[in-house]
């Protein structure tokens, strides 16, 4: 009997670590992007939970009027939020060691900067990890490209907008009612509802929901029956089966007759590309719109654009929106400003000229 002994290659500790990091056999793929993603997202999540529960009030406007955001200071799940870093800090990098004490750091809203910056790094690395895993498996890279839309949106509201406005205090609070407050103030100051890029984003999100529901219902309605009436239709599918699980010809015929022939896709690949591209492109445009409005390139202004032969203004919906904007603007940060910026101008802006 002949025994063949194969000599095992001796690899360094670093080599074994690299192989483990990049192995696609792990239950959860780590990857080099994951090396940065894991600690940053863990940090952001941990600080968010602690601050949401127990952070003391924050002087968001820099006028010695702290705003409470945590559960232990009287909020509930809906009203609670991580309050943005104080206007007194502006855009300064404000880690814990830059403050005279932890109490001062908390009072000035240091946790917000810590959470946001770690979160943005983490989600960017998550996107890179999606690409990395796709690359290792020989897949195409479009999963990471699709994920770039929410990454761009988060970057716009948490980083680009504060940079444009000159302070992290203008960033979106990390909470439910804080998000709504951010949206209302954004409308008041930038007229986002009249910005074409926001309109494209609305079309992307609502259209994506519609197309997703249409596709799912069409596929579910044209499944190829593999079971009896006493069994679930889902039992007729085996993971990895070669044959189609639904009849795309039947779905195409149904939808083509419901609308018209060319409204229905006859190519499954182009259909799924469309389903991915529509919401992604819409959200890209919205993120781009937020990023331009950050520097005060605002939505369209059609105020008092319709007048009669005597020069009297005939109100349009644009004027109704403008009146609502002024009302929202005078109500927010009411102790920080005596008047909204529009009303505090020395000379009234030209409307018709």
Swiss-Prot record:
Annotated catalysed reactions: 2 a plastoquinone + 4 hnu + 2 H2O = 2 a plastoquinol + O2
Binding site for [CaMn4O5] cluster: 170, 189, 332-333, 342, 344
Note in the entry: 2 of the reaction center chlorophylls (ChlD1 and ChlD2) are entirely coordinated by water. Herbicides such as atrazine, BNT, diuron or ioxynil bind in the Q(B) binding site and block subsequent electron transfer.
Post-translational modification: Tyr-161 forms a radical intermediate that is referred to as redox-active TyrZ, YZ or Y-Z.
Site (Stabilizes free radical intermediate): 190
Known EC number: 1.10.3.9
Classification lineage: Eukaryota, Viridiplantae, Streptophyta, Embryophyta, Tracheophyta
Listed transmembrane segments: 29-46, 118-133, 142-156, 197-218, 274-288
Record GO terms (molecular function): chlorophyll binding; electron transporter, transferring electrons within the cyclic electron transport pathway of photosynthesis activity; iron ion binding; oxidoreductase activity, acting on diphenols and related substances as donors, oxygen as acceptor; oxygen evolving activity
Residue list for modification N-acetylthreonine: 2
Site positions (Tyrosine radical intermediate): 161
Propeptide: 345-353
Organism: Illicium oligandrum
PANTHER family (alphabetical): PHOTOSYSTEM II D2 PROTEIN, PHOTOSYSTEM II PROTEIN D1
Modified residues (Phosphothreonine): 2
Membrane topology label: Multi-pass membrane protein
Residues binding chlorophyll a ChlzD1: 118
UniProt-annotated binding residues for pheophytin a: 126
Top-level taxon: Eukaryota
Name assigned to this protein: Photosystem II protein D1
Positions bearing the site annotation: Cleavage: 344-345
Compartments, record wording: Plastid, Chloroplast thylakoid membrane
Residues binding Fe cation, per UniProt: 215, 272
Similarity comment: Belongs to the reaction center PufL/M/PsbA/D family.
One Pfam family this sequence matches: Photo_RC
PROSITE patterns: REACTION_CENTER
């Amino acid at each position: 009997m002949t025994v063949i002994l194969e000599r095992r290659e001796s690899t360094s500790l670093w080599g074994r670590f690299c192989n483990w990091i990049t192995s696609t056999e792990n239950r959860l793929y780590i990857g080099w992007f994951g090396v940065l993603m894991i600690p940053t997202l863990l940090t952001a999540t941990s600080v968010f939970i602690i601050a949401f529960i127990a952070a003391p009030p924050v002087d968001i406007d820099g006028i010695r009027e702290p705003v409470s955001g945590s559960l232990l200071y009287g909020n509930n799940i809906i009203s609670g939020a991580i309050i943005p870093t104080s206007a007194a800090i502006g855009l300064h990098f404000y880690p814990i060691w830059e403050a005279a004490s932890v109490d001062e750091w908390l009072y000035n809203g240091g946790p917000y900067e810590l959470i946001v910056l770690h979160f943005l790094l983490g989600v960017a690395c998550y996107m890179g990890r999606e690409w990395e895993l796709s690359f290792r498996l020989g897949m195409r890279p479009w999963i990471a490209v699709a994920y770039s839309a929410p990454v761009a949106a988060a970057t716009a509201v948490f980083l680009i907008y504060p940079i444009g406005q000159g302070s992290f205090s203008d960033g979106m609070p990390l909470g439910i009612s804080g998000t709504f407050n951010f949206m209302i103030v954004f409308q008041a100051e930038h007229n986002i509802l009249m910005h074409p890029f926001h309109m494209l984003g609305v079309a992307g999100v609502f259209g994506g929901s519609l197309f997703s529901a249409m596709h799912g219902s069409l596929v579910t309605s044209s499944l190829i029956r593999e079971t009896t009436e006493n069994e679930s239709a889902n039992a007729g599918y085996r993971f990895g089966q070669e044959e189609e699980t639904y009849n795309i010809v039947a779905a195409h015929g149904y939808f083509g007759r419901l609308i018209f022939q060319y409204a229905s896709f006859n190519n499954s690949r182009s259909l799924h590309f469309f389903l991915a591209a529509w919401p992604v492109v819409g959200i890209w445009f919205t993120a781009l719109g937020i990023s331009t409005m950050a520097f005060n390139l605002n939505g369209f202004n059609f105020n008092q654009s319709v007048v009669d032969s005597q020069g009297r203004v005939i109100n349009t919906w644009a004027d109704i929106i403008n009146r609502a904007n002024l009302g929202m603007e005078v109500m927010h940060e009411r102790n920080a400003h005596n008047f909204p910026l529009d009303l505090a101008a020395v000379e009234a802006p030209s409307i018709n000229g």
